[in-house]
Amino acid sequence: NFAFLEGGVAWACELYAGLVGHCGKRNFKNMEKYDPHNLDPEKLADLFAEYGQGLVTHRPDPNDPNFVRWPGGWHQPDDNLIAHELDELGIEKAEDLRSLFEPNFYYGCEADDPLVSMGFDKRLNPFGARLKAMFSSDIGHWDVPDMTEVLAEAHELIEKKLLDEESFRDFVFVYPSMLHAKMNPNFFKGTV
């Protein structure tokens, strides 16, 4: 288990959805389509000459080492060095990302954060994932004048119909408990 105790869950939803989107487009197999080794310099020179629209006055020499220059001075690496982070993680399809995000990550949220609901929204998160938004109590914050009101403030998520009862229970009890007890079933032993 790994907890991000500050920052809420909205950023995690964005990261998760973004990675799912990128996984389909930027996996190793698809990235091969953009591998500079696969560029046909002869064909590219022909296209520049044909469609250069006055910017190219003659057909470029595809054998000129300056003809094809990569942005930022990028060089053509060996094929063996081309890799993608998702492939290195063993992600074969976008659905595999759910198994990384859903079971092991916990996202600490403040009581008054309306974006807590994003973590529980199966319609919003790809593949129906529920990211573990958890009540990371802001009782000790300098801007909380009365610590007895924090949980009631969190309950406003139900009153505003941002969370249902089950999600609220997961938010304030189940997920914070799981964070510790899932790794150590005796974590709370002797506390009651």
Model-derived features with residue positions:
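Active-site glycine-centered loops adjacent to acidic/histidine catalytic or metal-binding residues
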Residues: D138
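Divalent metal-binding pocket/active-site signature
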Residues: N1-L44, A49-G54
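Mid-to-C-terminal alpha-helical segments outside catalytic/metal-binding sites
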Residues: A10-W11, E50-R98, P103-K132, H141-V192
